[in-house]
């Protein structure tokens, strides 16, 4: 359309829409391949390859699992009373103390991880007429035999092992986590040489719960020179409740309690390096930006993260349909 000017000249006004030589293909409800002039990617599909240590407090487990740090494996002593937002377990982590099992390992691991602390308070349990602080060459602490620092292995004193009955009230206003265990000797001879009785028993109770464990005597596969095992259990004592421990043998006693906290702490298995940087969202692959609404890096996340989707790409059309001019 020609428009007259004040000086009798004319100007040309072109009516149409913007087009670009190379548009972006997007999916719509009715068509898988629509070309538009511009589109924004909504899916974060890559990580930085490293875990940022800010703003979250990251605790690198190095060669210790969270449970080994909890029990006090000698090579994990550096984790005593530590705190974290996210505990990172490494594939190279290993146990280096008396061989043990935890019947409900995942639940204990999750419970401690969410608490975000290994804060430990020693208590004055009274164990009479038994020998305390048992150790083993399977658990070296320095040059000599040792044991888990948070547990107390009780054995006979002389030729006696009396029935033990100990109570410990919770007079504080927070939950207390007690870790204890039961020793399973490999032979009947080992059983009587340590505990006198041919069959031991351990009962741990509160007003809300009771657990009774009978040791299973028998040889297991050799681990660090031992064919015996220890089973690890735990009890939570609420404020105003009381812990009661009754045993006539095979007791691996607590030395105190872990102070339980409520929060959003967690645990993650990852071999990504930890670096000085800032990122709100962490995955096992590394930290990722959270400036997109979706991500397909990993289902497992910690922090303020985009929602996980299976799609590699989702685009939001921010321009019109692209119809480039055809030259003939």
Swiss-Prot record:
Membrane topology value: Single-pass type I membrane protein
UniProt PTM comment: In natural infection, inactive HA is matured into HA1 and HA2 outside the cell by one or more trypsin-like, arginine-specific endoprotease secreted by the bronchial epithelial cells. One identified protease that may be involved in this process is secreted in lungs by club cells. Palmitoylated.
Disulfide bridge map: 52-277, 64-76, 97-139, 281-305
Cellular localisation: Virion membrane; Host apical cell membrane
One example of a Gene Ontology biological process annotation: fusion of virus membrane with host endosome membrane
Molecular function GO labels: host cell surface receptor binding
Sites carrying sugar chains: 8, 22, 38, 81, 165, 285
Keywords carried by this UniProt record: Clathrin- and caveolin-independent endocytosis of virus by host, Clathrin-mediated endocytosis of virus by host, Disulfide bond, Fusion of virus membrane with host endosomal membrane, Fusion of virus membrane with host membrane, Glycoprotein, Hemagglutinin, Host cell membrane, Host membrane, Host-virus interaction, Lipoprotein, Membrane, Palmitate, Transmembrane, Viral attachment to host cell, Viral envelope protein, Viral penetration into host cytoplasm, Virion, Virus endocytosis by host, Virus entry into host cell
Gene Ontology CC: host cell plasma membrane; membrane; viral envelope; virion membrane
Binding partners and assembly: Homotrimer of disulfide-linked HA1-HA2.
Function, as annotated: Binds to sialic acid-containing receptors on the cell surface, bringing about the attachment of the virus particle to the cell. This attachment induces virion internalization of about two third of the virus particles through clathrin-dependent endocytosis and about one third through a clathrin- and caveolin-independent pathway. Plays a major role in the determination of host range restriction and virulence. Class I viral fusion protein.
Other observations noted: Major glycoprotein, comprises over 80% of the envelope proteins present in virus particle.
Family from the record: Belongs to the influenza viruses hemagglutinin family.
Protein name: Hemagglutinin
Source organism of the structure: Influenza A virus (strain A/Qu/7/1970 H3N2)
């Amino acid at each position: 359309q020609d428009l007259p000017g004040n000086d009798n000249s004319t100007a040309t006004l072109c009516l149409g829409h913007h087009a670009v030589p190379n548009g972006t293909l997007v999916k719509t409800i009715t068509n898988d391949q629509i070309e538009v002039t511009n589109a924004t990617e909504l899916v974060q599909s890559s990580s930085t390859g490293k875990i940022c240590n800010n703003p979250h407090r990251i605790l690198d487990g190095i060669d210790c699992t969270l449970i080994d740090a909890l029990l006090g494996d000698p090579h994990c002593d550096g984790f005593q009373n530590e705190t974290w937002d996210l505990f990172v377990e490494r594939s190279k982590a290993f146990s280096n103390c008396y061989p043990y099992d935890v019947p409900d390992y995942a639940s204990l691991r999750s419970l401690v991880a969410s608490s975000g602390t290994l804060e430990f308070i020693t208590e004055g349990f009274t164990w009479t007429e038994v020998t305390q602080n048992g150790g083993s060459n399977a658990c070296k602490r320095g040059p000599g035999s040792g044991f888990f620092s948070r547990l107390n292995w009780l054995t006979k004193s002389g030729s006696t092992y009396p029935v033990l009955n100990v109570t410990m009230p919770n007079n504080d206003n927070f939950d207390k986590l007690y870790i204890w265990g039961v020793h399973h000797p490999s032979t009947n001879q080992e059983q009587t040489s340590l505990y006198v009785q041919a069959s031991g028993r351990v009962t741990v109770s509160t007003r809300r719960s009771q657990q009774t464990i009978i040791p299973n005597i028998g040889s297991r596969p050799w681990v660090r020179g031992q064919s015996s095992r220890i089973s690890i259990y735990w009890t939570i004592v609420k404020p105003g409740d009381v812990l009661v421990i009754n045993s006539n043998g095979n007791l691996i006693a607590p030395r105190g309690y872990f102070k339980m906290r409520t929060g959003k702490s967690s645990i993650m298995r990852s071999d990504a390096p930890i670096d000085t940087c800032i990122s709100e969202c962490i995955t096992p692959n590394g930290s990722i930006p959270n400036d997109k609404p979706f991500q397909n890096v990993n289902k497992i996340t910690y922090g303020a993260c985009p929602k996980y989707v299976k799609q590699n790409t989702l685009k939001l059309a921010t321009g019109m349909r692209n119809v480039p001019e055809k030259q003939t």
